[in-house]
Amino acid sequence: MNGIVIVDKPQGWTSQDVTARLRRVYATRRIGHGGTLDPMATGVLPVFVGRATRGVEFFEHAEKTYETLLLLGRTTDTQDVTGATLAEKAVHLSPADIEKVLPRFRGDILQVPPMYSALKVNGKKLYELARKGQEVERQPRPITVFELTNLGFDGTRLSLRVKCSKGTYIRTLCQDIGDALGCGGCMEALRRVRAGEYDIEDAVPLEQLLESE
């Protein structure tokens, strides 16, 4: 097979897990994915098969759109709910407080990459250092948030839709918004609903693809 398969990645799978299983389904070693998703994230994961793998490097630069749930009042070492709690604060915010802060995170901004990431410093991946309890200085990197929409706020959880450039960490965006609101926060859920020209409506659940394994 030569082509692109749009997978709806389930929670708990790494992007590499998905491609490893699909190698068996399509009986080929030439397979790659566009845009890594963390294990806790779900949604659009384009998988390039056969000659189509040439397109992976170009696709990496595509804009991505996510829907995320920000849990306010809790800060963790991984910037999401899977991590160890570093701080907890009571949340006393109004919808107006939210709308006052969100504009700071739209447009061209600088973002400090998280320690729990695959970025390398002096040849070592940051998450490897983080697991050893080490923290190193990271330089802020320019990103673009094209859209940041409040989908709902229940007093402690803020649902957001984010359209952003390559290299944007949604976990970090969640924590930074929580810090700006004065109570801290971490990412509770993440779903990629669009990657480049591929929409979640185009995606096939992974379990459906594995039925032919």
Regions found by a protein language model. Name each.
Residues 1-213:
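Catalytic/RNA-binding core of pseudouridine synthases
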